[in-house]
C-alpha cells in the first residue's frame, strides 16, 4: 500500500482521478477494453466529476459500481444516480454501464479492472461491512461469488456488492478517504474489512488522503 497525503480534499480528489485515468491509459495499450468500478457516497463526488472530464477512449471503458443499494435508480440513495450526476454528465458513456447483477458481472469478469474505492469510519469498503452476516464470503478472495447481497444493520436498505474475489483482481485500486478518523482506522492493523483489502491488494493499492 502507498499512502499519498494532500493538504486539501480537492487536491486528493484530483490526484485520485488522475491515478484512475493513468492506469486506464496504461492498460488500454495492451487490452481492447477494461472495466472501471467506482463507489457511491459523498466522498468520491468531486473525483468522479473530474474523472468524467478526462479525455479517455470511453467507448472502450465499461463502467460499474463497487456496490449499490437495492432501491430504484431514481431514488435519492441510489449510487447510479451519483454516476448520472458525475461520470455520465461528462464524457463517460452510459451505454457502457454494467449493472450489478449476476449475468452482467459474470460477462465482464475477464476484463482488466481498475477501481476507485471509499471507506467508512467503521472500516467498510464497497458494501463489505464489519457486521455483515456474509462477511466471511465477502472477504474471501478465493470465493466463487463475484457479487453478493449484503445483510447489515449499518444500512436502511438491502445492498449488493462486488466481493473481494472480484475487487482483489484489480490491476490497480485507489482508495480515497478524508479525515483523521478514517486515516487512523486505515493505519491500525486489525480485522476490519479495509485491513483485508490492504493485505489482498498490497502494492496495487494507493491511498489518497486529505484532512
Regions from the PLM with identified roles:
Residues 2-105, 110:
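N-terminal active-site beta-alpha-beta segment that forms phosphate/nucleotide-binding
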